[in-house]
């Protein structure tokens, strides 16, 4: 089949639109509202619904947030990063604040309940007290790639997870997924069972915490089901993701082939 000149031009325009459309959608801000919760030092809370503990209080320098059910996603949204900016130009900066999701919370038609540090970061210099006096503000937000983790680099493609202190070698294994590169949510975790030659699903306990009783002996191979912010779901694999003699409290990093969208 051959195209004439006008058909070729139209074809090029349509293909270009199909390529660029997901990028344009991904960079669009969504209107919402934000408020903040109180803490003694302005940082986050160690008791957040994601199960991060003390890590969830200080990660990203305390610029953290509880989010609505729609963004929490039954725990799959834990660790996601968003740019949030206030829509009052007289009180707020243009860039706003980049936050990490560490908790679940519903406010007055809000999608974000920010830590005090994060809410103050929305404000222009010397306008933070005025902004906080409002209590709730109109904002807009968009999903962004996470770049807060100490070992993160723009070209890295990693999943960072910690063996929960509640784990009991070798009878009970619980993992907390701390960081995922790009704009990916982890929606399933499975372990390879060498004895039965099949994958066995871990259970999402709550938030970012996954567990399994009687895990496989020896080095453990994991696979993670990731879902991008545009809804594409795929699996990534990590051989020997957890060593044979694993210990509670240890953290590991799986170098995997995640889709890293800008």
Predicted regions and their residues:
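Folded extracytoplasmic luminal domains of secretory or organellar precursors
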Residues: 2-262
């Amino acid at each position: 089949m051959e195209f004439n000149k006008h058909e070729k031009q139209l074809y090029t325009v349509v293909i270009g639109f199909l390529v660029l459309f997901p990028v344009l959608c991904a960079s669009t801000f969504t209107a919402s509202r934000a408020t903040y919760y109180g803490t003694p030092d302005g940082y986050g809370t160690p008791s957040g619904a994601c199960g991060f503990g003390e890590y969830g209080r200080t990660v990203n320098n305390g610029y953290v947030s509880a989010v609505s059910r729609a963004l929490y996603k039954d725990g799959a949204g834990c660790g996601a990063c968003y740019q949030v900016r206030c829509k009052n130009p007289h009180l707020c900066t243009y860039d706003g604040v980049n936050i990490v999701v560490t908790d679940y919370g519903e406010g007055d038609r809000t999608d974000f309940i920010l830590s005090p540090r994060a809410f103050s970061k929305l404000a222009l210099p010397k306008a933070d007290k005025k902004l906080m006096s409002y209590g709730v503000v109109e904002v807009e937000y968009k999903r962004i790639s996470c770049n807060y983790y100490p070992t993160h680099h723009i070209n890295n493609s990693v999943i960072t997870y910690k063996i929960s202190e509640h784990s009991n070698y070798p009878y009970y294994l619980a993992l907390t997924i701390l960081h995922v590169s790009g704009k990916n949510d982890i929606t399933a975790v499975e372990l390879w069972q060498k004895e039965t030659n099949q994958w066995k699903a871990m259970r999402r306990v709550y938030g970012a915490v996954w567990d399994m009783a009687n895990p496989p002996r020896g080095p453990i191979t994991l696979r993670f089901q990731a879902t991008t912010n545009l809804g594409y779901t795929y699996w990534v694999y990590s051989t020997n993701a957890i060593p044979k003699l694993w210990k509670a409290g240890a953290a590991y990093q799986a170098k995997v082939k995640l889709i890293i969208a800008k």
